[in-house]
A protein has these predicted regions:
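All-alpha RGS (Regulator of G-protein Signaling) helical domain and cognate RGS-like helical scaffolds
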Residues: 1-148
Length: 148
């Protein structure tokens, strides 16, 4: 990933591998329901959706400032993922999709815990940008989760 290449912090490499597993889970759903993969031909860091491209550009710029800023960007991405998945779950009744989203959310909560721990070790703090402070605190104060 961009931030791993910039800072060589292991958490970025570890989570990148996990994120590939998440992408594979979504691809299984796309294949099962005969849907086109909207990112099949995209290179890393390239998004057809302008909003996502702008967010990527903004976050990579922020994460390039310092290794601590990079860790905060990692936490922000997981924070946003949790928010987006929670929102998506309110609109989905297909049990296959719900199961994948719920497992993705577990992964994102675990990643948020890991990034936050690294932020603290680096002497920083993190304030959630998308989920509430109460949700963030509940995640941070709970143990790592496993998938189904």
């Amino acid at each position: 990933t961009f931030l791993y290449n910039k800072w060589q912090i292991n958490i970025f490499s570890n989570i990148s591998s996990s994120e590939q597993t998440h992408m594979d889970a979504i691809l299984l759903l796309l294949n099962k329901y005969n849907l086109l993969d909207p990112v099949a031909n995209n290179f890393a860091g390239v998004f057809a959706n302008g909003t996502l491209q702008n967010l990527y550009n903004q976050l990579t710029t922020q994460g390039s400032a310092s290794s601590l800023d990079a860790l905060k960007v990692g936490a922000t991405i997981e924070d946003l993922d949790i928010y987006d998945l929670k929102t998506a779950l309110t609109k989905v009744d297909n049990q296959d999709i719900r199961l994948v989203y719920e497992n993705l959310m577990k992964g994102s909560r675990n990643h948020l815990r890991s990034f936050y721990s690294n932020i603290l070790v680096a002497g920083g703090t993190y304030t959630p940008q998308f989920i509430t402070q109460a949700e963030f605190d509940a995640i941070i104060d709970s143990p790592m989760e496993t998938g189904k």
